[in-house]
Amino acid sequence: MIDLKKSQMWLDRVAYDMDTAKAMLQTGRLIYAVFMCQQSLEKCFKGLLAYQDKEIIPIHNLRRLAELSNVIQKLDEPMLMKLDFLSNYYINARYKEDLQQLSKGITEAVAQDFIQFSEGLITWLCQKMK
């Protein structure tokens, strides 16, 4: 049976995390903007899994979550590459020694692109829950 409360709980967190991603972009904390995009998408996929009445397993890989929620076949290769890129920022972004290495390729434009990508995918995923 579909548990709309559980699904909505995840989606409420998505909005908060996307707002945080935008705030991090504005303050120049670009790696954290990207990290929050990963968090937003992870929670959105888990919200979709809850909506589909599927088990929510404790994983953070966005491609795997797309598979589990049966939407991966609708995502093109560039989208999957972005999911893979964002998945790298889950735990690594939290460890100081990795921050410098991970930050190298993150410019303001890159962070903005991931925010736009995440917002678009979140909108699309949310439409699957109507």
Protein language model regions, located:
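Terminal alpha-helical segments
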Residues: 1-130
